[in-house]
Amino acid sequence: MAALNELKDIVVEGLVSDIFKMERAYHILSVIGSNADQLNDRALGNFGELFGAFQGSLEVDAVLAVARVYDSPSKQYPTRCLRRALSLMEDRVAELPEIAERYNTKLSLAFLGENSSVVGSVDLGRDAFVARFVPAFREILDSEAVSKAVDSLKYVRDKRIAHNEAAEPHGPTWEALKSLINHAQNFVGVVGWAFFNTVYVHDGAYFLSDDAQRPSRALRRLVERIRVTGRGDR
């Protein structure tokens, strides 16, 4: 089951890890942004510079995480990315096990549309499913919206983060990054049910998103404590 172990490594150590990093960064940054007035208030401790530094690091973390998910496969440096996972499934389908959880695999394919032929292929077995799922998912990755967002993402990574070139940072919006990560979550959800019998997506919700929000909840509590303590000192 070398192919299964390799696929699981790409998904667990690559995609799942980077999805978590992006979501964690996004939620922490959201809390910092929504509490900027309090964090910059001199009377409450003047923590603006501290959290400004956190912001810069978290933004880089988020960009790099999503960029890794959408990296191009490399024979020299095997990347844990969506396209490598798709190629592995396609090229080594005979080495993968039969679909472990057909019912939930079909439910997790809802993002493709109820009438998708991919959903019906699950009941036909592993070979038929992979033969239809891989092209369908590649079609998503090759869509104009995704291609445009990925190009913008890699521009920021290569020109501004990796090399610090004197170029205008035409980066993707947070909504675009969230959309890119949502595609990755959908992929992980399908493969998790199909080949690992592992729950990543249930009833349309990505299970680990709640864990990714825990640091931001802690930050909200910290901001509230700063606010209360500051009021008491006045």
Residue spans of the language-model regions?
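Amphipathic alpha-helical interface segments
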Residues: 1-149, 172-234
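Histidine-centered, metal-coordinating catalytic motifs and their short helical/loop contexts
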Residues: 143-169
